[in-house]
Amino acid sequence: MMETQLYIGIMSGTSMDGADAVLVRMDGGKWLGAEGHAFTPYPDRLRRKLLDLQDTGTDELHRSRMLSQELSRLYAQTAAELLCSQNLAPCDITALGCHGQTVRHAPEHGYSIQLADLPLLAELTRIFTVGDFRSRDLAAGGQGAPLVPAFHEALFRDDRETRVVLNIGGIANISVLPPGAPAFGFDTGPGNMLMDAWTQAHWQLPYDKNGAKAAQGNILPQLLGRLLAHPYFSQPHPKSTGRELFALNWLETYLDGGENRYDVLRTLSRFTAQTVCDAVSHAAADARQMYICGGGIRNPVLMADLAECFGTRVSLHSTAELNLDPQWVEAAAFAWLAACWINRIPGSPHKATGASKPCILGAGYYY
């Protein structure tokens, strides 16, 4: 009987707060469970350099390659800490799946750029490494995002009722899992990204811990209405978005400068919640259960806003109730995608991305 296999997934999302690594056990293409986690925060200097690369600037090619190497060293450190915590050696791991750090997402031009020096990562970890997951989907005409609906479908589908899985990272995205039909999903809009950027600009803090700042503000109805009028929200899915559309400078075009900073932050929380609620209402009107993962679940103000927007129509839960820690879900997805690559299983959620066909995602690098 063939032994089960261990995989590592590494994810660093649009919040740019650091890298998560998750250890996953598989039996071929069958999920058995997640067994460990490690997190390495980004140093402020690295985060600033990554944010600078979001905008057009000088010597971008050189800067991107140097940052790819720096990120891969940080990813390797995170993987090493995970292995140490589990008393494992690199030879115990079948493959490592690494998403990389998104710095540009332009599906309308057929590309999405995630920084990672994958051959270097394979060399440093001494683990077969799979990465560049989005390019194959884009080549098949897809958005290259979101990639997690197929993973959510494999783990979280219920044969009796439609479930929605909400991931609140920098960008928020949903996976809709109808019984007896293919999963689909899309980016609903900003998740934590605008709230984080506003907090960094006005309090010099990386994020609003526990929603403490937002809790001191009041919702500004006129500002909220203007933000909700953005044409992205009325576009049909499949669709995806990022900092290119919803950056701090976009928000500032709607401000007159006299707003209370706490009120703006409070409004941004409701903005995220309302866009999620509107998206679910249009795409999954029959859903009664929503399972939440990602960093946003730790913000009680945002969670209260979601509960108020949905009312009694949809009950809100953590993915922990489905046996996967909400902070582990995205990294675990890339371990699962690495297992799909190894086992030659298409892992692309083409109904979510709009690709013309299911694809085996990623490229592999031996050490």
From Swiss-Prot:
One of its GO terms (molecular function) is phosphotransferase activity, alcohol group as acceptor. CDD domains: ASKHA_NBD_ANMK. Keywords: ATP-binding, Carbohydrate metabolism, Kinase, Nucleotide-binding, Transferase. Gene3D superfamilies: 3.30.420.40. It is an enzyme of class 2 (transferase). Catalyzes the specific phosphorylation of 1,6-anhydro-N-acetylmuramic acid (anhMurNAc) with the simultaneous cleavage of the 1,6-anhydro ring, generating MurNAc-6-P. Is required for the utilization of anhMurNAc either imported from the medium or derived from its own cell wall murein, and thus plays a role in cell wall recycling. It holds the Pfam family AnmK. Its EC number is 2.7.1.170. This is Anhydro-N-acetylmuramic acid kinase. The gene is anmK. Belongs to the anhydro-N-acetylmuramic acid kinase family. Pathway: Amino-sugar metabolism; 1,6-anhydro-N-acetylmuramate degradation; Cell wall biogenesis; peptidoglycan recycling. InterPro entries: Anhydro_N_Ac-Mur_kinase (IPR005338), ATPase_NBD (IPR043129). GO terms for biological process: 1,6-anhydro-N-acetyl-beta-muramic acid catabolic process; amino sugar metabolic process; peptidoglycan turnover. ATP binds at G13, T14, S15, M16, D17, G18, A19, D20. It comes from Neisseria gonorrhoeae (strain ATCC 700825 / FA 1090). HAMAP family: AnhMurNAc_kinase. It catalyses: 1,6-anhydro-N-acetyl-beta-muramate + ATP + H2O = N-acetyl-D-muramate 6-phosphate + ADP + H(+).
